[in-house]
Amino acid sequence: SQQIGVSPWYWWADAPIIKHDAVYINNGVYTDGEPAVRYRGIFLNDEAPCLTTWVKNTFGTNYGGHEFYAKVFELILRLKGNMMWPAMWSWAFYADDPDNSKTADEMGIIMGTSHHEPMARNHQEYARKRGEWGAWNYNTNKDNLDRFFREGMERAKNTDDIITIGMRGDGDEAMSAEADTRLLETIVKNQRQIIKDVTKRPAKDVPQVWALYKEVQDYYDAGMRVPDDVIMLLCDDNWGDIRRVPNAKERKHKGGWGMYYHVDYVGAPRNTKWLNVTQTQQMHEQLTLTYDFGIDKLWILNVGDL
């Protein structure tokens, strides 16, 4: 459709649609070939108050519902993407509107959850019922957290979702000082057992990703490892600079490597929200570096509130 004058941004940015009296297509089959990156999409983040207010005024909901997400999914598809991490500051993609996940499946969008939302659960699902679930601490609250994780897998077992594994602290924070690689390896082991039990398939047959975001990369550098089928998701420094790339030995990891990249960031030591701080030249250079080092299984772009 873009070749006949329909911009991917025709709805979001009111991009004019070129009108034709007739459209002609040559006989035969034409293809651009497979995309260079298998899973590629966006992360809606830092969405309040701008996007949340706009959704309330446009769609009449206090959450991102399927009518809103259908527009986002269409944009992703028109931009040749196939994946998304949904907004999570105050919304819960799965719980707020059960038709959200159904719409993603119908439109061919592969869903995931962010680096601190394991096992297909949105953080708000925990935060809204903190009294029921108890402390976000695997050392002291293992049974409740395993139940929380299991419920997420029960809901996602018949989807194409990519399951985030591992665990960070409560609400996009580092884990407590007592956390160590042995605890995190135990968490991953138990999560994969839940995946196996719920799906009735070997865990290796269910796509999973481990995000080496912020302090989690330190665990990896200290020697923590996950099974060979898991996608290893490297990250930038939140301002568009790649922190590390896999060496020659690491590039043999069968699960492949991914990149989580920011053009929007809210956090210490400074925000980059609403600031055009990521130059296209820098982004091109850094992502070319990413691809050249074999990071081509999954790319996710944090676009803020879109």
Predicted regions and their residues:
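Solvent-exposed alpha-helical segments and adjacent loops
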Residues: S1-T53, N57-R78, W91, D170, ...
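N-terminal accessory/precursor segments of enzymes
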Residues: S1, P35-L51, V55-N62, Y69, ...
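The substrate-binding groove and active-site-proximal loops of carbohydrate-active enzymes
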Residues: S1, N45-H66, G81-A92, Y126-L145, ...
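Catalytic or ion-translocation cores adjacent to nucleophile or general acid/base/metal-coordination motifs
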Residues: Y94-W136, N144-F149, H284-F293, V303-L306
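General beta-strand structural signal in soluble alpha/beta enzymes
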Residues: L44, W85-P86, M111-T113, I165, ...
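Structured mid-domain segments that build the active-site/substrate or prosthetic-cofactor binding neighborhood
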Residues: L77, N82-W85, W91-A92, D99, ...
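A generic structural motif
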Residues: S7-A15, T113-A120, A203-L212, C235, ...
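Gly/Pro-rich turn-and-neighbor structural signature
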Residues: D14-N26, M88-W89, A95-E106, R130-K254
